[in-house]
Amino acid sequence: MAHPSQLGFQDAASPVMEELLHFHDHALMIVFLISTLVLYIIVAMVSTKLTNKHILDSQEVEIVWTILPAVI
């Protein structure tokens, strides 16, 4: 039964809904792991003192990886 200001799903009323809840939990865990990995990579890249001068001025690479997904 749904309650006011409830943060989760209501109780499942069918086996299909039970499976959807399990799928949601599984997908949410995968999204959480990917987000954690991306956050770790961002923090590692920002906090490192090592820089490559060729990466800082690579506008061509940025143009390619911005336009390529739009073309695909």
From Swiss-Prot:
Entry note: cofactor: Binds a dinuclear copper A center per subunit.
Membrane topology: Multi-pass membrane protein
EC number: 7.1.1.9
Residues exposed to the Mitochondrial matrix side: 46-72
One Pfam short name: COX2_TM
Stretches assigned to the Mitochondrial intermembrane side: 1-14
Membrane-spanning segments: 15-45
Example GO molecular function: cytochrome-c oxidase activity
Top-level taxonomic group: Eukaryota
InterPro entries: CcO_II, Cyt_c_oxidase_su2_TM_dom, Cyt_c_oxidase_su2_TM_sf
The keyword Transmembrane helix belongs to this UniProt entry's keyword annotation: yes
Subcellular location: Mitochondrion inner membrane
Catalytic activity as recorded in UniProt: 4 Fe(II)-[cytochrome c] + O2 + 8 H(+)(in) = 4 Fe(III)-[cytochrome c] + 2 H2O + 4 H(+)(out)
Keywords: Copper, Electron transport, Membrane, Mitochondrion, Mitochondrion inner membrane, Respiratory chain, Translocase, Transmembrane, Transmembrane helix, Transport
GO process terms (BP): electron transport chain
Cofactor: Cu cation
Disulfide bonds: none
Role noted for this protein: Component of the cytochrome c oxidase, the last enzyme in the mitochondrial electron transport chain which drives oxidative phosphorylation. The respiratory chain contains 3 multisubunit complexes succinate dehydrogenase (complex II, CII), ubiquinol-cytochrome c oxidoreductase (cytochrome b-c1 complex, complex III, CIII) and cytochrome c oxidase (complex IV, CIV), that cooperate to transfer electrons derived from NADH and succinate to molecular oxygen, creating an electrochemical gradient over the inner membrane that drives transmembrane transport and the ATP synthase.
Name of this chain's protein: Cytochrome c oxidase subunit 2
Native source species: Lepisosteus oculatus (Spotted gar)
